[in-house]
Amino acid sequence: AHTATTAFLAWPEFGEMLGGRYDNHPWNTVEVPIVNEAPDFPATKHFPAVFNFTDEMYQSKDFSRANSRVLLRMDASKLPPKEGAHPIDGDFPLVWAKMYGKGRVAYSALGHDAKVWDNPDIQKMYLELIRWSLGQTEGDVTPRPFRK
């Protein structure tokens, strides 16, 4: 959740397992358009195709769509240019899920403050990510390419 990409920086395998690393939050807390790329996934099926959300948006590095299924992404094209912002080929993943060996891994950049955690949609998303990680629900994590 949120700050997990900042943990265990001296342990490369942790970053590999998680699927990415923290690389700044150039806009700090801002309202952004979020694209739901996985309306069929248990943790994101309750979100509309595109919705606005306010949070501190973490930028990732060492992330590859070849290894993870992006569930939610920020539409960075709708934001003003910002120093330090460098989406990966225009892509700004926020929530993803993947397999790591026989384990299920999910990450979300959402959840900076209590207001976000008090949001019922975010609570449902995290509950469903946990249930999926435990194998209690099924969800396709086949990687998909970035589509603008």
Predicted segments with their positions:
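Extracellular ligand-binding/catalytic regions of CAZymes and related secreted enzymes
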Residues: G20, S77-K148
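Catalytic beta-strand/loop cores that center a nucleophilic Ser/Cys/Thr
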Residues: G20-G101
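Extended active-site neighborhood of metal-dependent phosphoesterases/phosphodiesterases
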Residues: F8-P26
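Short alpha-beta junction capping motif
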Residues: A1-F8, K102, S108
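Short catalytic/ligand-binding loop motif for oxyanion handling, primarily in non-cytosolic enzymes
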Residues: T5-E13, A114-W117
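Stable alpha-helical elements in mature extracytoplasmic
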Residues: A10, F14, P39, A43, ...
